[in-house]
């Protein structure tokens, strides 16, 4: 019997949350893959990242490996209800292993968000978001110009602004009244957070869908502290000069799953459920 070379093996990382059910599943999966000659368990530069928990766990794993997006693929196991990023439930480990054994490198890829914040002192901070990025002002009302492709669109007054990806459209964006976009649509969505609209101040008041090649700029008009959120991370900065949002050249890729639950089925399951008409 010929032993597989290390370089021939599929490098797999397992990332899980701290819940009891997730820990049990991690131990089971780790034991199986450790004794399988086709796989090599490592968290360093993996080919496949398996997340165990929920969509929040996959968000964390995305940020852990966002510098490896050119070659890494993700696959999620949900230990609760089926999520938007997780294809397997906790009782479907055998199905996952079967699919990994027959895997030929096929993937499903979706756009992500590139965010560049320029501070008043000239420093630039660049991040990537899988779901959304928001900006809020800590003190008083946020006043900011919204610029799309170098064209001044509106002066916003309110609590803040959210820019989401298609996959993130079902998250915070939806709770703000934004539209749900299919993840294969390469576009960004700008949604206002509690905008002021009266006889004096006016904004569009509805979400804006921006195509792939367009860039959104938010230019704050007041000095002070701002809270910037990138998915499940938050940062506080003073005197933000502008923030630019655009679709990143890289994408997130998932292991192609034969029994993949369709996006619209997930939307129905998450927000509508089954009912008798």
UniProtKB/Swiss-Prot annotation:
Q: What is the lineage of its organism?
A: Bacteria, Bacillati, Bacillota, Bacilli, Lactobacillales
Give GO cellular component annotations, separated by semicolons. Answer: cytoplasm
Q: Does the keyword Kinase apply?
A: yes
Q: Which organism is it from?
A: Streptococcus mutans serotype c (strain ATCC 700610 / UA159)
Q: Known EC number(s)? A: 2.7.1.23
Q: Does the keyword Ribonucleoprotein apply?
A: no
Matches recorded under SUPFAM superfamilies: NAD kinase/diacylglycerol kinase-like
Protein name, as recorded: NAD kinase
Residues binding NAD(+), per UniProt: 55-56, 131-132, 157, 159, 170-175
């Amino acid at each position: 019997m010929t032993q597989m070379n290390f370089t021939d093996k599929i490098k797999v990382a397992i990332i899980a949350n701290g819940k009891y059910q997730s820990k049990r599943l991690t131990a089971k999966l780790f034991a199986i893959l450790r004794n399988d000659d086709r796989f090599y368990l490592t968290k360093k530069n993996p080919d496949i990242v398996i997340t165990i928990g929920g969509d929040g766990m996959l968000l964390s794993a995305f940020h852990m490996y966002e510098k490896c997006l050119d070659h890494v693929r993700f696959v999620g196991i949900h230990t609760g209800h089926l999520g938007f990023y997780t294809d397997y439930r906790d009782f479907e480990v055998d199905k996952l292993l079967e699919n990994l054994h027959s895997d030929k490198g096929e993937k499903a890829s979706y756009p992500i968000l590139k965010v560049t914040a320029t501070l008043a002192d000239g420093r630039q901070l660049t991040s990537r978001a899988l779901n959304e990025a928001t900006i809020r002002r800590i003190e008083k009302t946020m006043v900011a110009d919204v610029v799309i492709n170098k064209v001044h669109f509106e002066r916003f007054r309110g609590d803040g602004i959210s820019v989401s990806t298609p996959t993130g459209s079902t998250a915070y964006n939806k709770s703000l009244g934004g539209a749900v976009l299919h993840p294969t649509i390469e576009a960004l969505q700008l949604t206002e957070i509690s905008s002021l609209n009266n006889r004096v101040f006016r904004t569009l008041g509805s979400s804006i869908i921006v195509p792939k090649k367009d860039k959104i700029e938010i230019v704050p008009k007041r000095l002070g502290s701002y809270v910037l959120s990138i998915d499940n991370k938050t940062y506080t900065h003073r005197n933000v000069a502008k923030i630019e949002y655009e679709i990143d050249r890289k994408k997130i890729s998932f292991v192609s799953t034969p029994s993949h639950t369709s996006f619209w089925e997930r939307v129905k399951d998450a927000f509508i459920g089954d009912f008798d008409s």
